[in-house]
Amino acid sequence: MMSHSPSMPCSALFLLLLLLLPPTFKGGSLRYHGPGWKLFHRLSKGFRSSHQRQTQQMRQNVPQGQSGDDCQGIFDLYLVLDKSGSVADNWIHIYSFAEGLVKKFTNPNLRISIITYSTEAEVILPLTSDSKEINKSLLVLKNIVPQGLTHMQKGLRKANEQIRKSTLGGRIVNSVIIALTDGLLLLKPYLDTMEEAKKARRMGAIVYTVGVFMYSKQQLVNIAGDPDRCFGVDEGFSALEGVVDPLTSKSCTEILSVQPTYVCAKDFYQVNISGHGLNNTSNMKQVICRFKFSDSKVVDESPSDMNEHSITCPGPKIKHTGEDVSLQVSLNNGISFIGNKLIITSTNCWSPRASQGIVFKRTWLMFLPVLLVTLLLLCCTWKLCIKPKKLPPPPPKPEKEPEEESPPPSSPPAPGRGPGPGPSAGPGPGPGPSPGSGPARSPVPARPPPAPLPANTNPTVIVACCGCGNRGMQGNLDTCCDYFHPSCHPMPLVWCHPKAQGGYPGFAVMKPSCSQASCRQKHCLCSNRDCFHLAEPPYPTRIVFQPNEKYFSITQSHYSPKIRFQTNQESLPVAQTLCSKMCSPPNQECYTFKSPQSPYQARYTKSPARMLPLLPPHTRQSLESLCHTYPFPPISKGPKF
């Protein structure tokens, strides 16, 4: 026989997978109208918008020289361009560079200002978000003729004036300055430029520098304040277009998404802000996460971690369910903020049986089918690879169960008491009628015969006797007078089992209580189990005892002598020295004592039980005189049962 290790059926896993796939991949199938049903409805929208923004972030975060995506950030952009005489005929490349940057910043809320400088500075386009004004200024820029000295500090001064004006007007946004130069700055202009750059950074602006042709790398780094915000073009003016994408990626400061967008009311949480250009700050201490509640309450939190693309901030508790909180981020210690009003909504995550709320995310469900498929494959692989275990064959059933040995049959009931005293030995169905009483009671119905014992079983018979001398176990018995002596108390006669088949049966006398009477002869027992013969007188004698009467009669006939007394239904062989048949009046069962000269074939009787005959004194005297009177054994006609 073979058996496999217990495992979950593959069909059950496959059925579970089929049941869970439709609600996972079908957007409109996730319907729940319990306390938090709005949570799942908003999660679907939040997941789609977050996925789109993360895709844009991946497109913008590309190495230098590769095409990036447009910038969707909201801030103020200032382009400060060099139009000094050293540019000469390469102005067209500077114009193409400016035009490429303007086209990369496509957010309609982004404001742009274009400034040119040489000996003096000029504002071509004041700070505006109007696309028509931006296009007109580009046409004006294209027709400019370069001339004059390189005084970058005057161009930065024009930018700082607009930043200051914008801040006083109540618009708090981030400012980005991109300054281009084509040569080395003299000492005085360089020092003045350094001072204007510091003023811009103090107002929250981020300064990027681009050098082309004969520029000083160290001057540009000092003006920008950070080596990462400095770009150099060594291949000439024509290579300016190659730095548009990396410069856009670096200068584009924007917030792409915030997670989670739904939080549990009255619970602490953390927000992860994803974006671009988030490292455009000199120190993490200048970064602020500002939470604005609907009741004009403002809570500022410092970030616990940040890098170029993400900021992690702890969030304040939201007391009311369904309340919206806007989030903004400042990279310059609160001077300006970036973010297009990111919204965080509180939901009821509490249940009667839960101590803490749980924020459910739809993205978790995306991994459930993968997990089920993995379990299904593992289950099938296990069933195919595992070797079946061979179990030992069951033991063969026995052809025939051994028969249980039946207990020996119960002892027969003792005969009724005669006129004389005599205790009964052994159990019986009921006491016999007492002398002098009315008619005898009806006999108790006989029990069904017990199961037959094996053929070689020899039972034990107990016969009343007294201590009449020495009795051997191999068949030596006294005469009838010894068994039924008047002076002896009734004792049981015991039929003992022979040690081997075919041996002589033995008699055991129980507790002899009287002295031995004078007996004249001994008789030997033969192995016949049916009956035993006594020396029969020349003429037959019939002796009948009535248990409840005090008389008996002896009649001579041609039949063998018979002795009647009350006993049970089983035949009981008695010693061969007896010369009579003993029968009980109620059931007429006889015990025949057969002489050795009997022509009848010996038969086995039923398994004899115990017999405890108790004879009155008159009966014992009659049997004793009978044995002395008739020494010759008669021939019995046959056994009777």
UniProtKB/Swiss-Prot annotation:
Membrane topology note: Single-pass type I membrane protein
Extracellular topological domain: 28-363
Domain VWFA: 76-247
PROSITE patterns, A to Z: VWFA
One term under GO cellular component: membrane
TM regions (residue ranges): 364-384
GO molecular-function terms, A-Z: metal ion binding; signaling receptor activity
InterPro entries membership: Anthrax_toxin_rcpt_extracel, VWF_A, vWFA_dom_sf
Chain segments carrying region Disordered: 391-455
Family annotation (SMART domains): VWA
Similarity annotation: Belongs to the ATR family.
Name this protein carries in UniProt: Anthrax toxin receptor-like
The species this protein was found in: Mus musculus
Gene for this chain: Antxrl
